[in-house]
Design a protein with these regions (language model features):
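Conserved N-terminal subdomain of the carbohydrate kinase-like
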Residues: 1-102, 106-114
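Conserved phosphate/ATP/ADP-binding segment of small-molecule kinases
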Residues: 114-170
């Protein structure tokens, strides 16, 4: 499994959580960090952010020379439209037969993370079109679908409707 996420130095999220879980499940995991943050973006102000976009394609190029393919590619935090486009390329390069899983990390509690422009959900929706499995929270789902965010609790019918609309993305 290739896990493509950020590394948040503080906070229970991103690669620092995904890698131990996958490893404990006996799954060999390769990591590809998209950014390094001093903390995650939820609830912290003044965090540092180092974008690793410039490193992603050279890493992918090296893997391509080694004919590395993955059984699954799992994405989390992607920090830009450019990273979304690069990951689409990586789906083709390293995962033609792979299960493609996208967690469109970009929002919580009805709010897009401050780091992202208002139109970012449309870019993330374009990546979800290429995925076999998408795992948004309710905020992310409604943003990608262009629907208003509604506070829970949620009915079974509401969740089913959201899921059907997400499935129609691709």
């Amino acid at each position: 499994v290739l896990a493509i996420h950020d590394i948040s130095c503080f906070g229970r999220c991103s690669l620092t959580v995904a890698l131990p879980i996958l490893s404990a499940a006996g799954i060999e995991c390769t990591s590809l960090p998209t950014a390094v943050l001093s903390t995650h973006t939820g609830g912290f102000e003044g965090f540092t952010y180092r974008d690793l976009t410039a490193d992603i394609l050279p890493i992918s190029d090296h893997w391509q020379t080694l004919d590395i393919e993955f059984n699954a590619i799992y994405t989390g935090f992607l920090g830009s439209f450019e990273q979304i486009d690069i990951i689409k390329q990586m789906f083709e390069r390293h995962g033609k037969c792979a299960l493609k899983i996208v967690d469109p990390v970009m929002a919580d509690n009805g709010q897009l993370y401050a780091i992202f422009p208002e139109n970012f959900p449309s870019g993330m929706a374009s990546l979800c079109e290429k995925a076999d499995v998408v795992m948004p929270n309710i905020t992310e789902a409604t943003l990608m679908l262009g629907e208003p965010y509604v506070e829970g609790p949620y009915s079974h019918e509401y969740i089913e409707d959201i899921m059907k609309k997400l499935a129609a993305l691709g």
